[in-house]
Amino acid sequence: MAKEISSELLNTILTRVGGPGNIASCGNCMTRLRLGVHDSSLVDPNIKTLEGVKSVILTSDQVQVVFGPGKAHRAAKAMSELLGEAPVQDAAEIAAQNKRQLKAKQTSGVQQFLAKFATIFTPLIPGFIAAGLLLGIATLIATVMHVPADAQGTLPDALNFMKVFSKGLFTFLVILVGYNAAQAFGGTGVNGAIIAALFLLGYNPAATTGYYAGFHDFFGLPIDPRGNIIGVLIAAWACARIEGMVRRFMPDDLDMLLTSLITLLITATLAYLIIMPLGGWLFEGMSWLFMHLNSNPFGCAVLAGLFLIAVVFGVHQGFIPVYLALMDSQGFNSLFPILSMAGAGQVGAALALYWRSQPHSALRSQVRGAIIPGLLGVGEPLIYGVTLPRMKPFVTACLGGAAGGLFIGLIAWWGLPMGLNSAFGPSGLVALPLMTSAQGILPAMAVYAGGILVAWVCGFIFTTLFGCRNVNLD
């Protein structure tokens, strides 16, 4: 295990979050150890001062400890082992020490709500990336080698095999989301999965594709299973709340037999009567809003320019339902490459800091250690190790990202909208083969590469001109 995530460091973190008895869950995303906590008043915000910890994001029920790419998974695994061995400690003394500090650190209700999306979607991200990469590589090979869609032979069969994973993922994605969402909101995962499946079924007996539900109306009322992910999230939340209320009044002897049964009946009724139409309206409204922002160059610039701030506050996972809505409405995720420009702006800013700093300075060492992950789309090392501590370069990095977003928005406005072939995927240079458009994969790759180049150059120029004044370059 790397020095930065030694057992001593993890034991210190465990103590400062209130001890094992305060830990509700332990997980990770690509760069962060995510610890769910029972009582946030027991958490010491000075965890971020520990050597090896890049930053800490606090919400009402979760502590996100930023380690960087490749380390978060090892940290989560080691922390889980510690939690399995450690006795529960009395954290009253820690609470008394931290209570006054944390009064100024309360997170907003919006941030708490968006933090739920990390719990729901983070476990799905590796699958999104894998399926998207396979689809992108297969599409690129088919385009370059001019393989017709109806071709026969070993190569077409291999390409179809590579594409089948994304088809399977997006066909049954709502069931995975329903399961995770019900758990995130405090319910039973399988109940959420069953309710989500209602959105997947077909209600037209004449349809030749899909899975017919066996009825076409709900006691005479029409069924319109629109809304997809938006509707499923609402239904999973309702399912978890209803389950909690039912369980409160259910005798223990009947809990196993009747709680889920009653929960499903009530939630399904609400889904058919209220949630499906409501989810459909929200889905259409959200799609309309972001499609118009995407087609507006200045809207694209604003989105790209603000995304790094969302990452800092740990709420960037809240965009994932929007990605899924855009996949349904457009066939590709046009928002993701725009937001990816934020990371490219950071790369440009970091290169400017490297150029302006002394040959043997600590800053150059920091940039060298963080620039490769930044080029590959992992921005936290640059954020927390290079730009954010110096503030001005962070602002100029945001401006560089905004310039890249403006470029992509202008190209879309001129008639070439493009996007990611998956709801979620890697950013940076790794995402190049995942780009697609109505005009094909190669034009989309060219637009994305152009946006990255613009963000690099503008981030470099803005930081050189405005981001290095009165900034510690040692």
From Swiss-Prot:
Primary residence: membrane
Subcellular location: Cell inner membrane
Cited InterPro entries: Glu_permease_IIB, PTrfase_EIIB_Cys, PTS_EIIC, PTS_EIIC_1, PTS_IIB_1, PTS_Sugar-Specific_Components
The enzyme's E.C. designation: 2.7.1.192
Pfam short name (any one): PTS_EIIB
Domain PTS EIIC type-1 stretches: 115-474
A GO term from the CC aspect: plasma membrane
Topology feature Cytoplasmic, residues: 1-123, 179-180, 239-260, 323-334, 390-393, 462-474
Transmembrane regions: 124-144, 158-178, 181-201, 218-238, 261-281, 302-322, 335-355, 369-389, 394-414, 441-461
Ranges in the topological domain labelled Periplasmic: 145-157, 202-217, 282-301, 356-368, 415-440
Origin superkingdom: Bacteria
Catalytic activity: N-acetyl-beta-D-muramate(out) + N(pros)-phospho-L-histidyl-[protein] = N-acetyl-beta-D-muramate 6-phosphate(in) + L-histidyl-[protein]
Keyword annotations from UniProtKB, A to Z: Cell inner membrane, Cell membrane, Kinase, Membrane, Phosphotransferase system, Sugar transport, Transferase, Transmembrane, Transmembrane helix, Transport
UniProt membrane topology term: Multi-pass membrane protein
All residue ranges annotated as the PTS EIIB type-1 domain in the record: 1-89
Catalytic residues of the enzyme: C29 (phosphocysteine intermediate)
GO BP, one annotated term: phosphoenolpyruvate-dependent sugar phosphotransferase system
A molecular-function term among this protein's GO annotations: protein-N(PI)-phosphohistidine-sugar phosphotransferase activity
Domain notes: The EIIB domain is phosphorylated by phospho-EIIA on a cysteinyl or histidyl residue, depending on the transported sugar. Then, it transfers the phosphoryl group to the sugar substrate concomitantly with the sugar uptake processed by the EIIC domain. The EIIC domain forms the PTS system translocation channel and contains the specific substrate-binding site.
Record's function text: The phosphoenolpyruvate-dependent sugar phosphotransferase system (sugar PTS), a major carbohydrate active transport system, catalyzes the phosphorylation of incoming sugar substrates concomitantly with their translocation across the cell membrane. This system is involved in N-acetylmuramic acid (MurNAc) transport, yielding cytoplasmic MurNAc-6-P. Is also able to take up anhydro-N-acetylmuramic acid (anhMurNAc), but cannot phosphorylate the carbon 6, probably because of the 1,6-anhydro ring.
Record-linked NCBIfam families: PRK09586.1
Protein name, entry field: PTS system N-acetylmuramic acid-specific EIIBC component
UniProt organism field: Shigella boydii serotype 4 (strain Sb227)
